Amino acid sequence: MKQLVLIRHGESAWNLENRFTGWADVDLTPKGAEQALAAGEHLRKAGYEFDVAYTSVLRRAIRTLWHVQDAMDLMWLPVVHSWRLNERHYGALTGLNKAETAAQYGDEQVHIWRRSYDIRPPLLEADDERNPKNDSRYAKLNESDIPLGECLKDNVERVLPLWNESIAPALKANKRVLLVAHGNSIRSLIKYLDQMSDEAIMEVNVPNGIPLVYELDDNLKPIQHFYLD
C-alpha cells in the first residue's frame, strides 16, 4: 500500500478577508498557524511518518508545511518546492473581495468564474504589476508557462506533469509522501486520483489544515481516502 497525505494550507490573511488570492503571496493568520500545527499533531498521534514532502512556492503553503514538520519532529524532511502546486491563478480578480466582486458583476457571473471547470476569470493584462513574470521566483520559467488567469482545467494540466514526473515515481518507490498545497491544486489531484467528472469535482471543497489521507495500490489507484481530524 502506498501512502499519500494531502493538506491544504491553514487559513490565510486573504481567506479571512474573503479575497481572491491565487498566486498572491499572502501569509497565514494566527488561526492558520494553529490549524497547521494541529494537522501535524493529528498525524504524529496517528503514527504517520514521511520520506519526502512537496509544496508550492507560496508562503502560506510553505509555512503550513513548516508547522506540520515541526509538530511531527520532521524538520529534516526533504522538501520539493514547485510552482506547479501553486493555487489556481485568479487573473484580474486577484486581490478583490469576493462579495464586492459579486455586487459588481452579479452572483451568477462570479459563480461561473469560481466554479466552472473550463471558464477562466478575466485575465491580467501583460503589463499588470501582478503578472507573475515580474516575480523572481518564476524567472526560470518560459513566459508561455506563466498564467495570466486559470480555470480549474488549466490547474489540472499544470499539476499533472509534477505528478507524473516526480510524485508518482516517489510513491512507486515506496516513499511516504506528504503534500501541502492549495485548494485547487489539491482538487486537481483529487480529480485525477478519483477519476471524477468535470461536474463532480466542482462540488468538492477542501478544508484548510485537515489532512486528507489516500491509501493507494501498487498502480496508484485509491483503495480508500479519508480526512484525519
Curated annotation (Swiss-Prot):
The active site is at residues 9, 87. Belongs to the phosphoglycerate mutase family. BPG-dependent PGAM subfamily. The lineage of its organism: Bacteria, Pseudomonadati, Pseudomonadota, Betaproteobacteria, Burkholderiales. Homodimer. The record marks 182 as: Transition state stabilizer. Pathway: Carbohydrate degradation; glycolysis; pyruvate from D-glyceraldehyde 3-phosphate: step 3/5. Keywords: Gluconeogenesis, Glycolysis, Isomerase. This is 2,3-bisphosphoglycerate-dependent phosphoglycerate mutase. InterPro entries: His_Pase_superF_clade-1, His_PPase_superfam, PG/BPGM_mutase_AS, Phosphogly_mut1. Gene3D superfamilies: Phosphoglycerate mutase-like. It catalyses: (2R)-2-phosphoglycerate = (2R)-3-phosphoglycerate. Substrate binds at residues 8-15, 21-22, 60, 87-90, 98, 114-115, 183-184. It is an enzyme of class 5 (isomerase). Catalyzes the interconversion of 2-phosphoglycerate and 3-phosphoglycerate. CDD domains: HP_PGM_like (cd07067). GO terms for molecular function: phosphoglycerate mutase activity. It holds the Pfam family His_Phos_1. It comes from Polynucleobacter asymbioticus (strain DSM 18221 / CIP 109841 / QLW-P1DMWA-1) (Polynucleobacter necessarius subsp. asymbioticus). The keyword Isomerase applies. Its EC number is 5.4.2.11. GO terms for biological process: gluconeogenesis; glycolytic process.
